[in-house]
Amino acid sequence: METLTSSSQSLISSPMSKKDYSSEIICAFDIGAKNPARTVLEVKDNSVRVLDISKLDWSSDWERRIAKDLSQYEYTTVLLERQPRRSPYVKFIYFIKGFLYHTSAAKVICVSPVMSGNSYRDRKKRSVEAFLDWMDTFGLRDSVPDRRKLDDVADSFNLAMRYVLDKWNTNYTPYNRCKSRNYIKKM
């Protein structure tokens, strides 16, 4: 198990060939310059496998770093956490959509954050709790390092899992606070 000593090392990963036509590869990005995060899930035969959960760094040379991060897998769906219109991170969304437009068959979807609540701190706390519960479910809790800043990887993981569960019409109580199916917005 690799810890997050380097900004682009994986928190959790599994080996997989770049092309596996009988599965769906879902990637979710929690957008940000200093603390972006990516989760990659494989959905195959009604089961979910965690391929990768990574903390990334796009603080400098961001075009090259994002392109490298996008080129590691062949995704069928890419989920991007929606950003406010005037956010400096909107440029990342447009870059990712443009990069994948001609180079990939992936469907790119901007989605609302999974958790809603009274305060930013409360939302982040609930996101980390749901993430750790899922890590227990997948038997990967021991792979998660003790860190104070897990909210970014938690947010990316929860984006991906909510998408999978919605496709299967499955309710998961921590995600129920968002309006069902209304979280997907086109940019």
Curated annotation (Swiss-Prot):
The scientific name of the source species is Vaccinia virus (strain Western Reserve) (VACV)
The keyword Magnesium belongs to this UniProt entry's keyword annotation: yes
Q: What class of enzyme is it?
A: hydrolase
Taxonomy, superkingdom = Viruses
Q: Which cysteines are joined by disulfide bonds?
A: none
Keyword annotations for this protein? DNA damage, DNA recombination, DNA repair, Hydrolase, Magnesium, Nuclease, Phosphoprotein
Swiss-Prot/TrEMBL cofactor(s): Mg(2+)
Q: Which residues form a coiled coil?
A: none
Tell me the Gene Ontology biological-process terms attached to this UniProt entry: DNA recombination; DNA repair
- The residues forming the signal peptide are none
Q: Name one Pfam family in it.
A: Pox_A22
Q: What is this protein called?
A: Resolvase OPG149
Q: Name one GO molecular function term.
A: magnesium ion binding
| Cofactor binding, note field | Binds 1 Mg(2+) ion per subunit.
Family that this chain belongs to: Belongs to the RuvC family. Poxviruses-type subfamily.
Q: What is its EC number?
A: 3.1.-.-
State the protein's purpose.
Plays a role in DNA replication by cleaving viral DNA concatamers to yield unit-length viral genomes. The concatamer junctions contain inverted repeat sequences that can be extruded as cruciforms, yielding Holliday junctions that A22 protein cleaves.
